């Protein structure tokens, strides 16, 4: 059914990310570039945010989801080209708090946005880590590990919410995951 194409793509994307995220997390762990002390508290927020994000995405039209994804791509592209996060981090190391009280909150918005657009969260987690005073290596490694809970919770959310609607799902699909 045409009305669920984007939701199916996002849910399936998150399900496939889960497996590659495990491999990536292990690889970065072996290089000692994962800040595990942040992964766990970030994950709490990410799991909650990803499930809520999947539920919110399920209420949006294909057209609105396409616009959200397009805007995300433009903003991330501008950030990557401009290097704004790295420039700010050089100017003011740790200009975003990564205290034990703030980290789950950061995780929740990362999980929420990531599950809406179908990504593992690295585009948000890496800049957050850099803004929090960590180096790029730690940011990428920690983001890789955080992709596991985002992908798992997001995919489960899409499976659940896809079963609560009256649409013709493709044969073999579990909710919005194919």
Roles of regions detected by a PLM:
Residues 1-8, 23-116, 128-138, 148, ...:
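Juxtamembrane transmembrane-helix boundary motif
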Residues 10-17, 143, 147, 178:
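Short hydrophobic/aromatic, small-residue-rich stretches within specific transmembrane helices
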Residues 14-26:
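Hydrophobic, membrane-facing alpha-helical anchors
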Residues 19, 152-153:
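Short arginine-rich
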Residues 119:
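Conserved, well-structured core segments that form the ligand-binding/active-site neighborhood
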Residues 124-125:
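Hydrophobic/aromatic end-of-helix segments at the C-terminal termini of transmembrane alpha-helices
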């Amino acid at each position: 059914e045409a009305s669920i194409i984007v939701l199916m793509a996002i849910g399936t994307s998150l399900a496939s990310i889960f497996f590659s995220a495990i491999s990536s997390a292990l690889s970065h762990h072996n290089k000692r570039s994962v800040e595990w002390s942040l992964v766990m508290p970030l994950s709490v927020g990410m799991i909650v945010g990803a499930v809520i994000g999947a539920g919110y995405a399920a209420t949006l039209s294909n057209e609105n989801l396409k616009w959200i994804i397009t805007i995300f791509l433009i903003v991330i592209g501008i950030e990557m080209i401009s290097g704004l996060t790295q420039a700010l981090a050089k100017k003011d190391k740790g200009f975003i708090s990564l205290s034990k009280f703030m980290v789950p909150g950061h995780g929740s918005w990362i999980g929420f946005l990531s599950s809406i657009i179908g990504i593992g969260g690295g585009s948000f987690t890496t800049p957050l880590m850099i803004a929090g005073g960590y180096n790029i290596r730690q940011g990428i490694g920690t983001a890789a590990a955080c992709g596991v809970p985002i992908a798992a919770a997001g995919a489960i959310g899409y499976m659940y919410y896809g079963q609560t609607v009256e649409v013709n799902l493709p044969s073999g699909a579990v909710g919005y995951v194919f």
